[in-house]
Amino acid sequence: MEYAQAALELIANTMTIDTDLARLALQEERLQFDAFDQCTAWALGSRIKALSEEAGVALAIEIRLGKDTVFFYSMPGTGPTNADWARRKRNSVELLHTSSYALNLKLEKEGSTLEAKQGLPLRDYATHGGSVPIRVRGVGVVGVVTVSGIPQRDDHAMAIHALAELCGVPLHEVALD
């Protein structure tokens, strides 16, 4: 009986991962800007800050355009650890051009790690959710938005909520279930 229960849990977990991965791919396809500059970064970062205040959570928020940090805000209640998590998650997204949450789920499904698969040090790279590539239609990845301070799925959702608003995509069409 224990084996059957474990097998059912594994199947359910795999289905959840596959469902999330499909939705994450949709997010990366749909959440694209026509243009993105420092003013857009300010609007995005400010919206994430407002959403986090509405939710009563403290976040570190970082937005990069190319290799330049164009927005950073560490809310009261966060600390250096949150900024370091943001750096590590952002490094993974800058290298692999997919969200840190998608990377996490893909590696979990494979039973692997970024260190084992890519040889990347855990000190500098993390695959916990909360970092999302910023895409411009017809151009590709131009930057990264990263959120750190709450559980990884919630970090990711916070970034996606703000991206959907600024890209004019209804949140219900791209949000994780």
Name these PLM-found stretches.
Residues E115-A164:
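Extended hydrophobic
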Residues A58, G149, V169-E173:
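Generic macromolecular interface patches on structured domains
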Residues E54-A55, R137-G138, E165-P170:
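Secondary-structure boundary elements
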Residues N13-A25, S112, H128, V132, ...:
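N-proximal short alpha-helices
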Residues E94-H97, H156-D177:
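Short, solvent-exposed cationic patches
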Residues E2-G79:
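Intrinsically disordered, low-complexity terminal regulatory regions
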Residues C39-W42, E108-A116, G168-H172:
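Short, positively charged
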Residues A55-Q118:
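Structured interaction and signal-relay segments at domain junctions
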